[in-house]
């Protein structure tokens, strides 16, 4: 039977976390305008949207862990977007091409919905769009890109940052900017590549980190494991001071320099402060098999 992955705004749920709502609360579309979470105190907060990918949910364990890491790090307002029906969570399997194609088609709808939510935050609750960051995994990375395009169409400006966690590869390998996550979708676009099979293997951001050359990740035997590691790497970079260092790399043409030769103007730390480093382009990031994963030989950038 064909999977029913029909997108409907009414099916979207938001899991919202903050320092005074650490266990999270659940919002739906009809409650967005009257919930007391969005008050005058929201204006000054840094807001982070988390957007999951194919077959996943907004309260998957990796996103819950990242949400907790974010609110421990700073007074973030974290909004995890659950579009699980549109992502075929209940109906498809990883081998279901029809279900996946439907989920791909739904990413634009979800992106527009996130952009409309952003408009509400900006216009009604006076949140600065320069304080809003999107973090998307797999299809969620491209969804974040579509949201970034939509907020620009709405003349709201650009998001502060989009972090694409191993943006989905299938159906996107030959896509141009209008049809995928792109460097122009936010003021700064950071991309973490961890699977050459399930993720895109070309530069799409201001900085593109190829962790372990963007191929199989340490400790992983399946592509799905490597694909998910991007989420875990970022979470650990948020939780710990340990810097996962990226050193400049021209794919296919050169061997990256050892991180022992890194300087603050040539290399970049993966994570929320990546934009503070001047270097742009593609970077190779060596990684350890176990958390906190960083392989930096004690180097301080």
UniProtKB/Swiss-Prot annotation:
GO terms for molecular function: phospholipase A1 activity. It comes from the Eukaryota. The keyword Cell division does not apply. Expressed by the venom gland. One of its GO terms (cellular component) is extracellular space. One of its GO terms (biological process) is lipid catabolic process. It catalyses: a 1,2-diacyl-sn-glycero-3-phosphocholine + H2O = a 2-acyl-sn-glycero-3-phosphocholine + a fatty acid + H(+). It is found in: Secreted. InterPro entries: AB_hydrolase_fold, Allerg_PlipaseA1, Lipase, Lipase_N, TAG_lipase. It is an enzyme of class 3 (hydrolase). Its main location: secreted. CDD domains: Pancreat_lipase_like. The active site is at residues 138, 166, 227. The keyword Chaperone does not apply. Pfam families: Lipase (PF00151). Keywords: Allergen, Cytolysis, Disulfide bond, Hemolysis, Hydrolase, Lipid degradation, Lipid metabolism, Secreted. Its EC number is 3.1.1.32. Disulfide bonds join 5-88, 177-182, 220-225, 242-269, 243-294, 262-267. Belongs to the AB hydrolase superfamily. Lipase family. Catalyzes the hydrolysis of phosphatidylcholine with phospholipase A1 activity. May act as an allergen and induce hemolytic activity. PANTHER family: LIPASE, LIPASE DOMAIN-CONTAINING PROTEIN-RELATED. This is Phospholipase A1. It comes from Polistes annularis (Paper wasp).
């Amino acid at each position: 039977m064909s999977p029913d992955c029909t997108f409907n705004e009414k099916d979207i749920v938001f899991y919202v976390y903050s320092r005074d709502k650490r266990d999270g609360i659940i919002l739906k579309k009809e409650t967005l305008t009257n919930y007391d979470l969005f008050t005058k105190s929201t204006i000054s907060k840094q807001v982070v949207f988390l957007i999951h990918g194919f077959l996943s949910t907004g309260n998957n364990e990796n996103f819950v862990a990242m949400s907790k890491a974010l609110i421990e790090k700073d007074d973030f307002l974290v909004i995890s977007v659950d579009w699980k029906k549109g992502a075929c969570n209940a109906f498809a399997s990883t081998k279901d091409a029809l279900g996946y194609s439907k989920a791909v088609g739904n990413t634009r709808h979800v992106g527009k919905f996130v952009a409309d939510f952003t408009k509400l935050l900006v216009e009604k609750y006076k949140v600065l769009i320069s304080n809003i960051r999107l973090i998307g995994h797999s299809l969620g990375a491209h969804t974040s890109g579509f949201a970034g395009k939509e907020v620009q169409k709405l003349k709201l400006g650009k998001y502060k940052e989009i972090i694409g966690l191993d943006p989905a590869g299938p159906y996107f390998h030959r896509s141009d900017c209008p049809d995928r996550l792109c460097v122009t979708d936010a003021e700064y676009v950071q991309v973490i590549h961890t699977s050459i099979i399930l993720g895109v293997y070309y530069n799409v951001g201001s900085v593109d980190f190829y962790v372990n050359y963007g191929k199989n990740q340490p400790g992983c035997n399946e592509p799905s494991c490597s694909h998910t590691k991007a989420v875990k790497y970022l979470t650990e970079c948020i939780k710990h001071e340990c810097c996962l260092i990226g050193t400049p790399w021209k794919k296919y043409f050169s061997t990256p320099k050892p991180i022992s030769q890194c300087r603050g103007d040539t290399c970049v730390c993966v994570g929320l402060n990546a934009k503070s480093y001047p270097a742009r382009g593609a970077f190779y990031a060596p990684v350890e098999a176990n958390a906190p994963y960083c392989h930096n030989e004690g180097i301080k950038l």
